[in-house]
Amino acid sequence: MPILQKGEIVLQFVKDYEEKLREGQISKKGLARLIYKDYPDLFKDVEDARECVRRYTGAKGDGSSPNSPYTLKSTIEHGQKAHKLPQSLAQDKKDFILPTGKKYLILSDIHLPFHDEEALQSALDYGIAQGCTELYLNGDVMDNYWTTRFTTDPRLIKTFTIETEINQTKQFLNYVNTLFDKVYYKFGNHENRWRLHLWKNADKLSHLNTFDLENVLELATNEITYISDSRIARLGKLTIMHGHEIYGTYSPVNPAKGMFNKMLCSTMLGHFHQTSTHHQGTGKGDKIGVFSTGCLCTLTPDYSPLAYIKWNHGAATVESFEDGTFQVDNFRIINGKCL
């Protein structure tokens, strides 16, 4: 085929579509399709036409047609102007930074109203006796029994309702607020049941802040700091999380070892209702400690009456220092005694 004739045709098309090419309204391949459609006898296929378009617009990258008046070389800047990325809806979940230089009592998995009164009171008394001024509630303070996706026992409605559970949780929060200088409430997967229940059964109301659990519990009113279930906290060099935030942490050894395999940094968690500790060093000489705390709920729930085989009552104190280091007392509670 006469190359000159092909070139003249391509240049004419480029001239006719110059503005659209510059604005990104048509691609070189799109222009090649138009050329091939009108001149199928001159070009073998669309790709042949596209090669000619690239050659005569100076985009082929081999120095061909350097003097072409229609040089339309692709650039990142041009692409950004012609085609903008869609706005992302992703929200950056920044870590919650806890103040160092203080001593914390860490409680998790109380599961009101299925709490163990003796174990819970013992944990609070022990924390105060050890000089803890801050209380960190590390998730699953309330059970949210009536908002679960699992089958519930309808007979229990005679004993307590959603309102009962909310009121008991508020009563507990008001109580601990008198015992400590500062209370933090990190939501766990059981608190998250509330939001999921609204989405599924009352989606028209779920966008109203009034129905957010942290507002129903009046946390801000009582100066209790709320931390969402999808955020983790950092206390110096110690990461604190409920335990549901990351999948695949099960370990046949213990929860602490399973979380170490995932986090690879010093971490404290609840969720598994089991006291365990895993210590390991790194090749750089750093020391890592991972701690899973026991629970403060019944050890014989209806859905798992032998849970006490693996579960145990327990909590932890963490003394944090200004340099980010920390000291942990991951204690068990047996018959009301903190060990």
PLM region spans:
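Active-site-proximal loop/helix segment associated with metal-binding centers of metalloenzymes
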Residues: 201-239, 243, 250-253, 292-297
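Basic, short loop/linker segments at the boundary and entry of helix-turn-helix/winged-helix-like folds
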Residues: 1-17
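Mobile, glycine- and charge-enriched loop segments
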Residues: 79-117, 235-236
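Short, charged amphipathic recognition helices of the HTH superfamily
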Residues: 14-39
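Core catalytic region of metal-dependent phosphoesterases/phosphodiesterases
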Residues: 107, 112-220
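Structural motif
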Residues: 102-104, 134-136, 238-239, 266-268
